[in-house]
């Protein structure tokens, strides 16, 4: 496909390429979407679970849902698209990955500079002392308590109605404005302020490579449109660039 070869050429000649990823890059790793069809949780709207109000009302119910999600994330493995971005960073082409995902698969694939705008489901944060811990297995006693102070732990993610970390968001916009190429993979771009990052990159002169099987917010704005899934893109681009994934 000519557009893939053109993407390879643009990336090879780039000075500061950045990736921006969403749920589509992890779907092929088996990460369930918010509105999964798995038994109990199909009856719940995520907005009734992923909010501070829901946690204050019924922390055990919220943790039961997150325990289910943690179990599936721990069982998942990075796919070729995650590994492609890690290899591009290894080669010096890619400078950072900015992700809306909370599954930690970019780091597990080997990416080092990863900005997790919405947090990480494998981390918990104490509501009392603020200390953090990482899950190696799903929590058993729900809601879990802080090993330091005994306070109630909450998932270290951004819930509906909560602001993103200001310093992290500023860093992400700084990277976007500095980039000369941005690869957008697997996101509709519907959720702001994260969805504004590719537009900020474009306004600063970056070339946008938009990888998504369906039209999205960046269709018509991007310089290169690749209507394909993340893994197919990774396979094609890695061949074009001679990268082993």
UniProtKB/Swiss-Prot annotation:
Deacetylase sirtuin-type domain ranges (all copies): 1-245
What does the Swiss-Prot or TrEMBL cofactor note state?
Answer: Binds 1 zinc ion per subunit.
User: Residues that bind Zn(2+), according to the entry?
Assistant: 126, 129, 146, 149
Indicate which residues the UniProt annotation says bind substrate. Answer: 66, 69
UniProt: NAD(+) binding residues: 22-41, 100-103, 186-188, 212-214, 241
List required co-factors: Zn(2+)
Report the catalytic activity.
N(6)-acetyl-L-lysyl-[protein] + NAD(+) + H2O = 2''-O-acetyl-ADP-D-ribose + nicotinamide + L-lysyl-[protein]; N(6)-succinyl-L-lysyl-[protein] + NAD(+) + H2O = 2''-O-succinyl-ADP-D-ribose + nicotinamide + L-lysyl-[protein]
Query: Which is a Gene Ontology cellular component entry for this protein?
Result: cytoplasm
Give the Enzyme Commission number.
Answer: 2.3.1.286
**Per its UniProt entry, which superkingdom is the organism in?**
Archaea
Q: Where is the active site?
A: 118 (proton acceptor)
Q: Which Gene Ontology terms cover its molecular function?
A: histone deacetylase activity, NAD-dependent; NAD+ binding; protein-malonyllysine demalonylase activity; protein-succinyllysine desuccinylase activity; zinc ion binding
Looking at the keywords, is Glycoprotein present?
Answer: no
Q: Which family does it belong to?
A: Belongs to the sirtuin family. Class III subfamily.
Question: In the UniProt entry, what is the domain comment?
Answer: 2 residues (Tyr-66 and Arg-69) present in a large hydrophobic pocket are probably involved in substrate specificity. They are important for desuccinylation activity, but dispensable for deacetylation activity.
Under what name is this protein listed? Answer: NAD-dependent protein deacylase
- Organism equals Aeropyrum pernix (strain ATCC 700893 / DSM 11879 / JCM 9820 / NBRC 100138 / K1)
